[in-house]
């Protein structure tokens, strides 16, 4: 395993190692990609955890009940594999597929100012949650916000009116009292 990572700013978290599988050094992985198997399309990963960074190569992977089971090059022992539990799986941003003009990766939405139809600033998108019905944006107050409330807004066409990545703004149809 090589220890020369990509620049941290250029990396996107696409999964997380959460446990070991068997005695041959396989690890259990939760994939943030959709579908989850898309994570296996990236043969080289940068692993990060508490200041530690490792470069690894994917040998094989398969689906399981709670995610993926993955074999990494040079990882042949259960005890060694256990040391990777908790590591984030990252890939360079440049490897992500291009999206349609009206589609966005979650990382692109994080940090956008959220302004409603009445020009009221709610705050900034902190992160998104995956729910059964639709994704939900967690909007936390920032300097100049209408109030100090954290808001949960659905990421739907009915709520999100416009996104301007260059301006760093998302316009929404949402009442300030909700």
From Swiss-Prot:
Organism of derivation: Pseudomonas putida (strain W619)
Function (record text): An accessory protein needed during the final step in the assembly of 30S ribosomal subunit, possibly for assembly of the head region. Essential for efficient processing of 16S rRNA. May be needed both before and after RbfA during the maturation of 16S rRNA. It has affinity for free ribosomal 30S subunits but not for 70S ribosomes.
Residue span, PRC barrel domain: 100-178
A Pfam family recorded for this sequence: RimM
Family classification: Belongs to the RimM family.
Quaternary structure and partners: Binds ribosomal protein uS19.
Protein name: Ribosome maturation factor RimM
The entry's keywords: Chaperone, Cytoplasm, Ribosome biogenesis, rRNA processing
Domain of life of the source: Bacteria
Chief place of localization: cytoplasm
